[in-house]
């Protein structure tokens, strides 16, 4: 009998969703501290063209020190430059309008929209688009009309407004989020996190990647299936050709 064990990290704090449900709206300093960590982690993924596509408080975990862990990359996809995604995924309350409408979309822009919903929820304790039923909620998301409570600070209201833009091209990008006054306001809480988390990824050398496989027999089929979860639209044969290529 062959036994296989899956070793996972234990994250004591549980889901961010449960934390907000229990304690309600968070103080701005705490909400932004968590949001900065979410953006830092997501920005790192985006540097490698990996989009999460299912960001929501249920998929964000907190450790014993209340630091963020992004989880559940089951919907994640690789989006090379110039490539558009088309799979409809994510939770309706957090999905971007372009996904709801069935348009081709940029995964990074859709992720940023979801982050705006999360920031709103952290600061208010409720969601900006919640029509009580699925159909009404989807219509609200498509329109992109919502009200920002007056008790939010000007910085918070401005950042949320810049993120929750229905048209992706009008949506603030990751680097400008990081440089926004709300983020800079609480920079002292995580001084080690700064611009190295944002921007293009450094090129990987052949030495860092390891030598290419020499034949199809060297390709592990389980790993190939895992690669296909990121390259949704690429056939297995094409992936194998790329793995065998010396480039």
Predicted feature locations:
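Conserved catalytic-loop aspartate of Hanks-type protein kinases
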Residues: 111
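Structural helix C-cap motif within protein kinase domains
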Residues: 124-127
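Protein kinase catalytic-loop region centered on the HRD/HxD motif
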Residues: 38-50
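A conserved short helix/loop substructure at the end of the activation segment
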Residues: 164-176
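Activation segment signature within eukaryotic-like protein kinase domains
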Residues: 34-35
């Amino acid at each position: 009998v062959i036994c296989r064990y899956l070793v996972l990290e234990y994250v004591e704090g549980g889901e961010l969703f449960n934390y907000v449900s229990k304690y309600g709206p968070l103080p701005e300093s705490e909400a932004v501290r968590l949001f900065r960590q979410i953006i830092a982690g997501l920005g790192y993924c985006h540097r490698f063209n990996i989009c999460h596509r299912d960001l929501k408080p249920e998929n964000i975990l907190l450790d014993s020190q209340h630091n963020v862990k992004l989880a559940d990359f089951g919907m994640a996809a690789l989006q090379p430059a110039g490539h558009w995604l088309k799979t409809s995924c994510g939770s309706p309350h957090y999905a971007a309008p372009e996904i709801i409408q069935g348009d081709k979309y940029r995964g990074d822009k859709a992720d940023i929209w979801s982050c705006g919903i999360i920031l709103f929820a952290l600061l208010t304790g409720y969601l900006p688009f919640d029509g009580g039923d699925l159909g009404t909620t989807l219509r609200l998301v498509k329109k992109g009309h919502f009200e920002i409570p007056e008790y939010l600070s000007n910085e918070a209201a401005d950042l949320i407004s810049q993120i929750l833009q229905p048209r992706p091209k009008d949506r603030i990008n990751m680097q400008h989020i990081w440089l926004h006054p709300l983020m800079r306001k609480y920079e002292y809480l995580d001084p080690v996190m700064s611009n190295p988390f944002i921007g293009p990824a450094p090129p990987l050398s052949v030495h860092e990647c390891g030598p290419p496989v020499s034949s199809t027999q060297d390709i592990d089929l389980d790993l190939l299936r895992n690669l296909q979860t990121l390259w949704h639209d690429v056939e297995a044969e094409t992936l194998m050709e790329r793995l065998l290529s010396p480039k």
